């Protein structure tokens, strides 16, 4: 009982924090805005940047360019060698990371307040004067090719690759963000420089910060170091993806003790009026861990899997509903049948009042736990800003969830959970699996 009251107190404390989350929008150049939550409890600052320049814009024949560029930016810049650059970061407790998704080129900066000037100077060097020495390029190429080679042996990586090939055939999202092995050796220094010069443009930049930094300070740094990225060049765009999903089962036969199962169907956009209905529905169906319907039916009642899950996934150019499970080869047919059955049940009958109440309670009370550090707050600000939402989202978010009704869930389920538009991918050696497409 004591633990319960401690937990309840913590939830209420965080709830008050969420309500008081004061998000400032700073207009620092033309139409560019940064979001900031000032928190001077600790002398720490977290800043997140995102350019719309992920691996999805990699040119044909140079797949992996965005990722390789990100990997090389801290491998020497200005007059610093790779070793010297990393040492000055470490000596001053500065974390500076570059990485990419299919849609975005991310920069994470985490530093003590007293080292803000130095942090931005080093970030500026990395973005404007990377050395791109041949020795470092070749080393990073070797690392990337090794990871890609190993990915063809790992069942999880195989599943992800084949899943993308089915869902995103003939689209840039089809490829791993690391690229394609045969393209890696084709990438030269001039390609890396061209990527930076042509794609990291302020028109496609999002910025979010949390910690011991004031509005005027953040604006000063952004104007000083990022206005120069107003290069007015035409940035490569990822094409829209249109995929008609059919009711199919794909099999990649592999001699494994267990089979991996992935499935996917129609998704929903972030600005759809029924997005929160889909969000709550997914939690009840397969996003709620041990409390979801899929876990109850497939694991708890029948003991067929260790875990089973579902989620809503969003790319800039495509949205989909997906999920997966792992089970013994002899139980694959059973698991697929149960998953399909549960999707149909929610589509036809919806969910119960109790399920809806429990889902709302969890989704509301757990949200604040995702905002318990400057890094997490900055990440949440960045993602919310990139979703095209306003700074008052954090005040309204819980109301959006509370407003979801049983009828709303039935309506959105009828759109998303169409058994005729969901495919399954199995990797393993399943028994008695019929009507399959081998890949």
Set out the residue ranges of the language-model regions.
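N-terminal targeting signals for Sec/Tat export/insertion, comprising classic cleavable signal peptides
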Residues: 27-53
């Amino acid at each position: 009982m004591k633990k319960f009251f401690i937990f309840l107190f913590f939830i209420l404390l965080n709830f008050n924090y969420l309500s008081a989350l004061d998000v400032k929008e700073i207009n620092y150049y033309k139409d560019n805005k940064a979001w900031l939550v000032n928190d001077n409890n600790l002398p720490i600052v977290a800043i997140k940047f995102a350019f719309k320049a992920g691996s999805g814009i990699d040119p044909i024949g140079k797949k992996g360019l965005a990722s390789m560029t990100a990997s090389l930016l801290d491998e020497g810049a200005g007059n610093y060698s790779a070793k010297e650059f990393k040492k000055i970061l470490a000596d001053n407790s500065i974390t500076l990371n570059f990485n990419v998704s299919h849609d975005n080129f991310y920069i994470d900066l985490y530093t003590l307040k007293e080292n803000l000037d130095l942090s931005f100077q080093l970030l500026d060097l990395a973005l404007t004067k990377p050395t791109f020495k041949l020795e470092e390029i070749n080393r990073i190429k070797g690392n990337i090719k090794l990871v890609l080679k190993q990915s063809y042996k790992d069942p999880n990586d195989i599943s992800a690759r084949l899943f993308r090939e089915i869902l995103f055939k003939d689209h840039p999202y089809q490829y791993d963000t690391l690229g394609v092995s045969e393209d890696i050796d084709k990438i030269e220094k001039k390609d890396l420089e061209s990527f930076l010069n042509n794609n990291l443009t302020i028109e496609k930049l999002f910025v979010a910060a949390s910690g011991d930094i004031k509005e005027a300070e953040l604006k000063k740094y952004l104007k000083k170091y990022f206005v120069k990225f107003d290069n007015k060049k035409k940035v490569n765009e990822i094409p829209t993806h249109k995929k008609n999903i059919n009711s199919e089962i794909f099999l990649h036969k592999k001699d494994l003790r267990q089979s991996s199962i992935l499935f996917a169907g129609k998704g929903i956009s972030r600005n759809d009026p029924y997005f929160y209905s889909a969000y709550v529905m997914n939690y009840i169906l397969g996003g709620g861990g041990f409390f979801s319907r899929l876990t109850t039916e497939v694991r708890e009642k029948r003991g067929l899997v260790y875990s089973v899950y579902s989620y809503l996934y969003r790319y800039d150019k495509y949205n989909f509903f997906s999920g997966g499970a792992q089970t013994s080869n002899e139980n694959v047919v059973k698991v697929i049948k149960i998953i399909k059955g549960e999707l149909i049940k929610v589509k036809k009958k919806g969910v119960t009042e109790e399920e809806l109440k429990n889902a709302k309670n969890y989704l509301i009370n757990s949200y604040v736990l995702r905002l318990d550090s400057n890094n997490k707050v900055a990440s949440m600000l960045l993602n919310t800003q990139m979703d095209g939402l306003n700074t008052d989202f954090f005040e309204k978010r819980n109301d959006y969830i509370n407003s979801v009704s049983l009828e709303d869930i039935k309506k959105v389920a009828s759109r998303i959970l169409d058994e005729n538009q969901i495919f399954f991918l199995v990797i393993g050696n399943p028994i008695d699996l019929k009507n399959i497409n081998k890949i």
